[in-house]
Amino acid sequence: MSFVHLHVHSPFSFLDGASRLDDLIAEAALHGMPALALTDHNNVSGAVRFQRKAQEAGIQPIQGAELTLEGGYHLTLLATGPKGYANLNRLITAAHLGQEPRATPGAMFALAPGHDRLQPACPLSALSHDTDGLIALSGCRRGEIPSLILRGRLAEAEAAARRYAAWFPGRFYLELHDERLPGEQALNRALRDLGEALGLPLVVTSNVHHRTREEFFVHDLLTCVRTLTRIDQPHPERPLNDQRYLKPPEVMIERFREFPEAVKNTLAIAERCRPVLDLDARLHPEFQTPDGSHPAAYLTHLVYDGAARRYGRITERIRRRLEHELTIITRLGYEDYFLLVWDVVRFARERGIRCAGRGSAADSAVAYCLFITDVDAIERGLLFERFMSLERAQKPDIDIDFDARRRDEVAAYVYRKYGADHVASVCTYNTFQARSAVRDLGKAMGFQEADLDYLAKRIPWHAGADEILTVMARYPELRQSGIPWHKFEQLVQAAERVARFPRFIGTHLGGLVISRRPLLEVTPLQMAAKGQVVCQFDKEYVEDLGLVKLDLLSLRTFTAVDDAVRAIGDIDYEQIPHGDAATYEMLGVGESIGVFQLESPAQRALQARLKPDRFEDIVASVAIIRPGPIKGNMVEPFLARRHGKEEVTYLHPKLKPILEKTYGVVLFQEQVIEIATAVAGFTPGEADQLRRVMTHARNREDMEAIGRLFRQKAAAAGVDPAVADTIFSYIQGYASYGFCEAHAAAFANTAYKTAYLVRHYPAEYFAALMSAQPMGYYPINTLAVEARRRGVGLLPVDINRSEEAFTVEEWSREAWEAFWGMEPFAPEYPATGKAIRIGLRAVKGVGEPAAAAILAARDGGEFRSLADLVRRTGGAVPRGPLEALVLAGAFDRLHSNRRAALWQVAHLLEAERIRQERGAGQAGLLDGDAPGLGAQAAEALEAASPQGTPAIADFGAAERYLKEYELTGLMVRTHFMRFVRERLAREGYLTAQEVRQRRAGELVKVAGLPVCPHRPPTRSGKIVVFLSLEDETGLIDLTIFEDVYQRYGHLIFTDPRPPLAALGRVDRRGGHVSITVNRLRLLDT
């Protein structure tokens, strides 16, 4: 006799399941169990993987969930098929919303009034209907019936059992457990008696939370994390023993020998169930064409209409390409998908929302003619099969970047068009990585939070929870940190056990899922923190379910571009010419800070060596500075051949037209496809399969099989076998490093145009870029330093001149020096006559409401004083924002003593409160002419008046400076390094600007603030650290090789990062200047 576990939790129970899903399935298969259920708490996130892996193991998957009901009771539910699964989704959704979902087209699902979205609770009324296809088990000790029995309320338990039996006629079982808990045997016998009295069947489960008894500690620890308790503290939800494991059938049979029918019923229930998911479904929404025509016909009409607008004259070459693509699209049945994406982009463009398609979709001429992408695939000779092919028959994936500020408008349009019951955000699973595991598990284990914080901050952010020992051995900042690793040994071991376990569900930044059928038939829905409706599957699983995923991504660069273009006024961004010599000249000296995709130190170094003078150079730049090409040693051959220092050769004449534009180097994935097509006669779809085998590092058998096929086909095409073998080895070496050319071209377009804005409109562009933070590679002060270097001033926040965001003003050095008594930073470029004014919201603590209230009041004229502002805003600006503005210097033109102004804030707000209480007639209260208001008012008035302000000494210059920097992230009036420059100059330290004039090999000393240290992968596998030092003249890049890094790594990767001083030799490569570091130390300040 066998047995089936019907109550099983995986890590998708979010901190209440301690064994990986694959391990649970393997354990069930090991013991010959015919089926296995998955019943995670209030979700089915593991359903797709569970069904796939169980079927692969020869086990029947039973999908269910443990539902939390109102009152906190638990109920185990199992779906017998797709209909039951849909009803299960409805009930889980009701639990997350606190009420039954009642979505109507154009309306969102809503939380019940007063319901906490983090505390699922399904109303009992939701169980009273539409439960077909669901089997219900009475649950664990937290089920309503067992809970009532344990409290001696037997009559109420019987009434509850009658209710459930009525809600699930012929499908309700009383659930027995044996977890060796007090009162358990009595409970089981009471349940048996109740079953006999009401004619209800029994079933046994093990309430599984971990695979083996040895994993109990992990389960207990995760429970402590979930309940915010320490392992030395009791909590009613903590397990008392290790009995919630996946017991072998013989153990279950032995333990329940008193209840043989209950054991048999596990098999009977399994026989009633079948897989609930159709993983071959096509749930794409049908696009309703405006003229009622077939979607394929309408798509063809739109494509040719767009082609006429793109090309003017549609040549035979264009027509053949479009027909080829349309044939593949329609044969695969994706015409509705293309129309859906076209419609979304059309909506955005009609409303002036900047957007652009990217990724392999730019390989499509159809996408270009639909204005989804701006890359001409025909002109560039891009292969559609890199995007879609009949052989691969995979769903197309079109990523679209939108202005970050307005992306939600586009998403709202999708909800309106397809209905709230057909659209939801894709979820993400926030998983345990090293830092989160250290913090969460360590706190539960009783470590001091300061110790955990110290440890977590020193672990690289990208390290997995099972890589802590690896990074400790590899990185000196961990080895030399003084961390007593023996103290954390058990914590590190626990972290390894929970690596990549999901902690909670999050919201995908841009993914929307759209379904032809109501989504509740496919997935439960729940509410995210910001009000979005989120499905319970991530981007991988929604595609497995046959749903359309629409990637509406937010790109802050577009926000900056849009602001800059509006500030400039007389520029057509779309028509910026690709041949501007001044832009290429700027890039050619490595001055690309602020340029999309080209601003990292590696890119700046590449630009200075590449000396780009054409758009194709930008496309190559985007593709080549990636971990793969760098590890594959593609950069040096490409540069040498680009500048004629190395001969360009081809293994076969057929390779020349393919590789000519990249100087014989396989740089793009599309080139691999073209080579296989030209040399071996592969169809484009077959060639893409070859690329995918190579790119994704498939197993040796796959590689050998595709290699044999390549050689056979090449020989049949007349290629010498030895040459064919060499070509295959050649592309095999490069294919895994290649980048998608279409994606590179799409990004290169934005890269070039933003470079044009940096070169010709630095004030407007950097102001917009600073307003759009956080984004890009550098902190905001680095952007400000670069703007100043380009002759653009930086003006402090001013209560009468600042707008909400950063803005551009006319400016002169003379006016600055006259007011501030110091000269601004010395620019390398001629002064532009313009300056960037810091916006109100750039000050930490000043949110949109406060800034809006200030600007609305200022419409009536400039503020005369702090008191005037408080009176005219009616006290709408709270104390926190006002004090932040004072400390940031926003009132300096009105109040020279910041400390005195700070004193007045609270008293002025109190006086304004009194004024409002006494009525609008007391308008003069803050001006001191409202007699007879009482002692409290008089006291407030006196304190708020200039006469009532005590004689307080103002902050010192250093204090003012540090507060400005703390609140804005900007060094406004001077740079920190200017405070120590005189001393450093005496000691022989150079500025970044001076280093750029020194000869290669010269030994120099530099100092500055460290910016963006990073350790990219290298071909050798050794660690090389790149970072920049920022001073008042700009950035100087440092290269730190492994031997030096091993000595000084503890100074680099710290939080916060202190100023550093470095000794090293000047390195000149092309036009790029950097320093190879010999010694590093903390800068004495």
From Swiss-Prot:
Catalytic activity line of the entry: DNA(n) + a 2'-deoxyribonucleoside 5'-triphosphate = DNA(n+1) + diphosphate
Location within or outside the cell: Cytoplasm
KW Oxidoreductase (keyword) present: no
Chief location of this protein within or outside the cell: cytoplasm
InterPro entries according to UniProt: DNA_pol3_alpha_NTPase_dom, DNA_pol3_alpha_thumb_dom, DNA_pol3_finger, DnaE2, DnaE2/DnaE/PolC, DNAPol_HHH, PHP_dom, Pol/His_phosphatase_N
EC number(s) from the headed UniProt entry: 2.7.7.7
Enzyme's top EC category: transferase
Gene Ontology CC entries for this record: cytoplasm
Keywords: Cytoplasm, DNA damage, DNA repair, DNA replication, DNA-directed DNA polymerase, Nucleotidyltransferase, Transferase
One GO biological process term: DNA replication
Superkingdom of origin organism: Bacteria
Pfam families associated with the record: DNA_pol3_alpha, DNA_pol3_finger, HHH_6, PHP
GO molecular function terms attached to this record: 3'-5' exonuclease activity; DNA-directed DNA polymerase activity
Keyword match DNA damage: yes
PANTHER family, alphabetized: DNA POLYMERASE III SUBUNIT ALPHA, ERROR-PRONE DNA POLYMERASE
Family: Belongs to the DNA polymerase type-C family. DnaE2 subfamily.
Role of this protein: DNA polymerase involved in damage-induced mutagenesis and translesion synthesis (TLS). It is not the major replicative DNA polymerase.
UniProt name for this protein: Error-prone DNA polymerase
